[in-house]
């Protein structure tokens, strides 16, 4: 173990012991200390689900990237393991950037982007991003002594050799494949496909997909590629997108393409892109397939456009609740992993409750809850809910029936900087909004609309004493409400 990795492990152990768990999410992965962003290496190995992540343990800001490490058996209760990687080699001294993991010959293999800096003729330095591997046993990892295994110089002419990062690996038959985010010489985002027979000798295969229209941002970060039902799915997180109506917002997005893939010719014919999440805090998703066949996705529950936390908080960054993916009606539907139901306690239910003007319902409150609201067809035109609320704080969700539009507003959630606080989304179902399922976990609200046809994720900075939930309707409406507290076993 290098001195740098040993130092990081010692530091995080000391800081974790000094951190009050009440200041952190109850059932979401969060930074053990310092900063985390992209999920990495989401995989099943040796009977456990492993999640790594971009990690700077020493303060709350992005810095030289390490890989943090957590494991779980049910995706609700997570165990913190020691940091897995540190930027301690010449080829990754500027950071161990994002990547993925796979099991091979009994070993847990991490594939990541090592960043180094090359001196230029004018004396300046320029980043170089190359792909590297490390072999481990689920806790300790040894970097391959001939890293990097693939460099930008191995890409064909026309490919950018500076931005070449975030490998996602899988195996088909007897061949390993990885897709890597890239740009072409005109700064247009694309994903390249590479292959290997042995994990150490890689070659370029093809450009799997690119931003031909020029409308899907610039660099395509954190790509993922997998089968879901009858379709192949490409996920990526484009930088610097322009807003497109209510589907995509300005800045960093996470999108998916459905399509058909020919494994022999490595041709992916993609359909139109869709947003994966319509909230304000969702980026760099990564998926894995569990032994039971479920495709599970997790993402960074923050955004480069809105990284705001209270000054009193000594950590920065958390992940979404893992979500089950399903292909339905030509789109990806998402639902919270079913394991959350094992932690349901203290149920509270209302059937056909009448709402007219603003009101509360006894027992319907809390900050670690699973809350479902069914809207009945009624006279209303505007229906709204305020969560994590009291006289000073609130995060509101307002449905405008005539426009079939949902407006999310966290202006009064406790943020102290001028970041994105309002977002509108068009409800996909032409029959309107029928069902809302909220997952609250102290610093976050995840909203699953119409059984997961759309999802909106929002981080909040609200003090925990703001526990109330308010309901409002401009005219009479009847709702069914079901709330469970979430209590860890």
Where are these regions (language model features)?
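Beta-rich carbohydrate-recognition and catalytic domains
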Residues: 1-166, 171-216, 227-278, 301-350, ...
